[in-house]
């Protein structure tokens, strides 16, 4: 019998045809666009050069640490770039007397995105006896000017919170 309303794609099924392993367990459309995008990203990284990326991120990280350490009441967690040159291009930090979520929200209002919370490292937070931290992450596309703007906003935010608490 004919259905009324929206168009039909499926009437009934008499049998099933299964693909061979491993394809029979893969549902839906393969991630073709994602694979093409991944290939383009890999070619771009190869063009820029992984050593150049690592060197640039190391410079940025040293600059970020210097700027954060210059702000009164900011404590950077973990080893400095001088202590661990191969460290990631990020800085996790605390601001005395201010919850990390408040710092992140206020910094966000100025158009700068940082992370706050546990960062999936609750055991480390227990060691430092803190409930949350803030984290500024860098990329090889980051600039010294962006770090300067972030650190100026952070210093301004810390001063504002001290003045109003």
Where are these regions (language model features)?
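Short, conserved charged micro-motifs
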Residues: 98-104, 145-148
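PLP-dependent enzyme catalytic core of the Aspartate aminotransferase-like
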Residues: 39, 109-115, 121-165
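Conserved small-domain helix->loop->beta segment predominantly found in fold-type I
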Residues: 26, 45-99, 162
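Short, solvent-exposed beta-strand edge segments and adjacent coil->beta transition regions
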Residues: 22, 86-90, 131-135
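Conserved N-terminal phosphate-binding loop of PLP-dependent enzymes in the Aspartate aminotransferase
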Residues: 18, 37, 89, 107
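A short glycine-threonine-serine/GTX helix/turn-capping micro-motif
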Residues: 12, 16-32
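Well-ordered alpha-helical segments within folded domains of soluble proteins
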Residues: 33-43, 91
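Single conserved hydrophobic/aromatic residue that forms the stacking wall/gate
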Residues: 1-6, 10
